[in-house]
Every structure is written in structure tokens, then in C-alpha cells.
A protein has these predicted regions:
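Bacterial N-terminal signal peptides that target proteins for export
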Residues: 1-8
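Sec/Tat signal peptide C-region and signal peptidase I cleavage site
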Residues: 16-23
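N-terminal secretory/targeting leader peptides
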Residues: 9, 23-116, 122-328
Length: 328
């Protein structure tokens, strides 16, 4: 009887061990933006495809809207392993690595074609920098072109002076300084409240963000289509979590990441067109700036690109040379 009991205990332990081994890895994916945002929807589809195709080896569960970690917390959470995977707005991480700010240099890349060339030129150095911080880069997707929102009409450089301006990274703070606007740091989740309370009167962001926030309901009547830059969100994985996957699963994740990146760029292009129309349909004035303002913004962009190149050093110079054939 004792022998039978010992055999049963041993078998139970073996079955339990097999079940644990077959359970696979589970990754909770931190997303800063709401479930309806195209970045979050794209990430959710990526997670679903990996989960379904991995044969139980990897399950990815998405947590949109900052429900797992807020936007400003995600990079650190993934780096420290509190979250195995997450998505973060790249240019908010300039203090981590200046290369992550390259896509937010005003008027450096003003079309999707140029944005893709800049991405290809900068990606190797960005991947290398993230690897040194214990992170694995999966994919990056741009927001639609950044335009200037304002509560009041802007017809001259003088109209910018003292305008309360939403800043969210070092680039937008510097733009405010160079144009005479007054910067206030506001995260994406706080945009509507900031405009409704008068904390800010203007911002640079995509037509998609304005549409999703129904920004016209907060007294914002103008969108100037200046196509300042195409900032990206990137998806990163904690390297220790990554190394727990077998080679086949790692290959699957990278394959699905490439598909998500392609789809994300297509969704961004579609949103760039459709969301500007949505702003106009809601009663906002959607327009280009006049030639004097355009020239002023381009001068600001040239100044900032030079400053960024100095800050980024030889790595930044090599990226700009690969992108445009010349350094700053």
C-alpha cells in the first residue's frame, strides 16, 4: 500500500512538472493609450497573433489606457522587469538616449517616405542602445504628421508669443523657447482637462490625437497642418524575459512584430488623411500656415537639428549622414 502511495505521489509530481513546463510564458503588455487608439489596437492584434501561433509557449495580455503602468512609467517598468513588454513614445526618452529623439526634430522628415528613410538610418543605433540597457526592440510605428492646434487663430510669429503650449518632451519644450510660447508639461491623458481649464491654449500633436480627444469640445478651433515630424511609438521587451523563450518562439515574435510594424505604418497613413477630415467635419478650421510662419518654423527646425546632432555626438552624426548624405 505504501509503495502504491509513493508511486502515485511521484506520478503526481511528474504530471505537475509537465503541466508547468507546458504552461509557457505569460507577458503582460503595458500600453499607454486607450484601446480605441490605432497603436493599441495594432499591439492587441500583434499579441493575439503571437499567442495563437506560439502553441502555448507564449501568451501576451495587453493592458491599454495606462491600466498596468502609465506612459511615463512604461520604459522603466520594462527595463526593470516589472512588465515583460510595453509600448512607449520614443522621443519622450531623450534623457535615456538622444537617438530616441531623432524622429521629433522639426521638419527633418515631413513625409512618410522621409520618415521611413530616417527610421532605417537610425534603427541600428537605436537597437544597439536599447540592447545595452537590457531591452530587445520589436517594432516602431509613427503617429500621423504633427500639426499645430490652437484655441485662437495664428497668422504671424507675433501670435505665438506667450501662447500657453503643451509640452511633453525636450523637443517640444525647446520649440516653445525658440518661438516664444510658454511651455507646460502635459501628458496625453491630461490633454482634454488642460485645454478645458485653460492650462494650455495650443499643442503640437497628430490629427489622430485631436480626433480621439474630441479636442473641439475643449474650445480648440484651429488645426494647422504643418507636418512638423512623425514621432513613433516603439515596442520593447525585457531581455531576461526574452531569453526565457526558445529560438522558435523568438523567431515567431520577430515575424509578427514585422507584420505589426507594416500594418501600423499603413494605419498611420490612413489616419493622417481621415482624421484631418474628422477635425474639419467637427467644425475646426484645418489649414496651412502662411509662408512667413512656415519659414519661421523651418528655421526653428534647423536650429534644433543642429543642437540635437551636437548632443547625440558621433552616433547622431552618422545617422544624419546615412539619412541625408550630409551631417550637421
Amino acid at each position: 500500500m505504501k509503495l502504491i502511495r509513493n508511486i502515485l505521489v511521484t506520478l503526481s509530481a511528474l504530471i505537475f512538472s509537465v503541466n508547468i513546463a507546458n504552461a509557457g510564458e505569460k507577458w503582460d503588455m503595458a500600453l499607454a493609450y486607450g484601446a480605441g487608439n490605432f497603436h493599441s489596437a495594432n499591439a492587441t492584434e500583434f499579441a493575439k497573433n503571437v499567442t495563437e501561433k506560439s502553441g502555448g509557449k507564449l501568451t501576451i495580455v495587453t493592458h491599454p489606457g495606462g491600466s498596468l503602468f502609465k506612459g511615463g512609467e512604461i520604459f522603466r517598468a520594462v527595463r526593470t522587469g516589472q512588465a515583460p513588454i510595453g509600448e512607449r513614445f520614443m522621443s519622450a526618452l531623450g534623457k535615456e538616449d538622444p537617438l530616441l529623439e531623432v524622429d521629433s526634430q522639426p521638419f527633418l522628415a515631413t513625409t512618410y517616405g522621409a520618415a521611413m528613410r530616417l527610421y532605417k538610418a537610425s534603427k541600428p543605433e537605436i537597437v544597439k542602445g536599447l540592447d545595452s540597457k537590457g531591452l530587445v526592440f520589436l517594432y516602431a510605428v509613427p503617429w500621423p504628421a504633427q500639426g499645430l492646434y490652437s484655441k485662437k487663430e495664428i497668422n504671424s510669429v507675433a501670435d505665438l508669443k506667450g501662447l500657453k503650449f503643451r509640452a511633453y518632451n525636450s523637443a517640444t519644450i525647446r520649440i516653445a523657447e525658440l518661438t516664444g510660447m510658454a511651455p507646460t508639461k502635459i501628458e496625453a491623458a491630461e490633454i482634454s482637462q488642460a485645454f478645458s481649464t485653460g492650462a494650455v491654449e495650443s499643442m503640437l500633436t497628430s490629427p489622430t490625437t485631436g480626433k480621439n480627444k474630441k479636442i473641439w469640445e475643449n474650445g480648440v478651433g484651429y488645426f494647422y497642418d504643418i507636418a512638423a515630424w512623425f514621432p513613433k511609438n516603439m515596442v520593447i521587451v525585457n531581455k531576461d524575459s526574452w531569453n526565457k523563450l526558445d529560438a522558435a518562439t523568438q523567431k515567431l515574435v520577430m515575424s509578427e512584430a514585422a507584420k505589426a510594424e507594416k500594418k501600423g505604418w499603413d494605419l498611420s497613413k490612413k489616419g493622417n488623411k481621415n482624421d484631418k477630415k474628422a477635425l474639419a467635419d467637427a467644425g475646426m478650421k484645418v489649414a496651412k500656415v502662411n509662408s512667413a510662419l512656415k519659414k519661421h518654423f523651418e528655421e526653428v527646425g534647423a536650429t534644433m537639428s543642429k543642437e540635437w546632432a551636437d548632443r547625440a555626438g558621433s552616433r547622431g552624426q552618422s545617422v544624419l549622414k546615412a539619412y541625408s548624405g550630409s551631417s550637421y
